[in-house]
């Protein structure tokens, strides 16, 4: 099964190196695959910092987060919480 939720990027600088690394590190604790998709359809796997940086995700963009795997619910909730916290940057 797959779970999805859309979240808005709220931190001032969007997805840059520090938030990408935080998201990558967060995903290491879950048995789930997480895919992010921007409003133009560009996709990035959360376990790839380079892909996350290429997602073109500036402040205000909507990102769909999709999780699949044994811990998909927990992984999705953790990713959404990280986005909602502004990656602890603001």
Curated annotation (Swiss-Prot):
Compartments, as annotated in UniProt: Cytoplasm
Alphabetized Gene3D superfamilies for the sequence: HPr-like (3.30.1340.10)
Gene: ptsO
Family: Belongs to the HPr family.
Organism: Escherichia coli (strain K12)
Annotated ranges, domain HPr: 2-90
Pfam families: PTS-HPr
Its biological purpose: Component of the phosphoenolpyruvate-dependent nitrogen-metabolic phosphotransferase system (nitrogen-metabolic PTS), that seems to be involved in regulating nitrogen metabolism. The phosphoryl group from phosphoenolpyruvate (PEP) is transferred to the phosphoryl carrier protein NPr by enzyme I-Ntr. Phospho-NPr then transfers it to EIIA-Ntr. Could function in the transcriptional regulation of sigma-54 dependent operons in conjunction with the NPr (PtsO) and EIIA-Ntr (PtsN) proteins.
Name of the protein described by the UniProt record: Phosphocarrier protein NPr
Keywords tagged on the record: Cytoplasm, Phosphotransferase system
Residues at the active site: 16 (pros-phosphohistidine intermediate)
InterPro entries reported for this sequence: HPr, HPr-like, HPr-like_sf, PTS_HPr_His_P_site, PTS_HPr_Ser_P_site
